[in-house]
């Protein structure tokens, strides 16, 4: 299983707008991805309710994971998005 640990770069954490950006990006990868707090249970990264339910704060470590084909590239792109608090999924890393 591919995994990336990254700190949330959005000051407000994964709430409202940043969560929406992240969920759209996770869906756009076409790869099933989970997201979890470092000490928590993984949830579907493409689910707005699940991502909001994490309550991840700015600066908090999260874990992105997937065992699907194409996971490495998808996780790298999502990790960059989260770490840098970007507005959209980067094309490449």
Swiss-Prot record:
Keywords: Cytoplasm, Phosphotransferase system, Sugar transport, Transport. InterPro entries: HPr, HPr-like, HPr-like_sf, PTS_HPr_His_P_site. The active site is at 15 (pros-phosphohistidine intermediate). Pfam families: PTS-HPr (PF00381). SUPFAM superfamilies: HPr-like (SSF55594). The lineage of its organism: Bacteria, Bacillati, Actinomycetota, Actinomycetes, Kitasatosporales. Its main location: cytoplasm. It comes from Streptomyces coelicolor (strain ATCC BAA-471 / A3(2) / M145). GO terms for biological process: phosphoenolpyruvate-dependent sugar phosphotransferase system. Coiled coil: none annotated. Residues 2-89 form the HPr domain. General (non sugar-specific) component of the phosphoenolpyruvate-dependent sugar phosphotransferase system (sugar PTS). This major carbohydrate active-transport system catalyzes the phosphorylation of incoming sugar substrates concomitantly with their translocation across the cell membrane. The phosphoryl group from phosphoenolpyruvate (PEP) is transferred to the phosphoryl carrier protein HPr by enzyme I. Phospho-HPr then transfers it to the PTS EIIA domain. Disulfide bonds: none annotated. It is found in: Cytoplasm. Belongs to the HPr family. This is Phosphocarrier protein HPr.
């Amino acid at each position: 299983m591919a995994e990336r640990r990254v700190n949330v770069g959005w000051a407000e954490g994964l709430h409202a707008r940043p969560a929406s950006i992240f969920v759209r990006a996770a869906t756009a990868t076409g790869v099933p991805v989970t997201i979890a707090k470092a000490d928590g249970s993984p949830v579907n990264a493409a689910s707005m309710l699940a991502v909001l339910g994490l309550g991840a704060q700015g600066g908090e470590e999260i874990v992105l994971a997937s065992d699907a084909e194409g996971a490495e590239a998808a996780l790298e792109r999502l990790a960059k998005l989260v770490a840098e608090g970007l507005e959209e999924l980067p094309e490449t890393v």
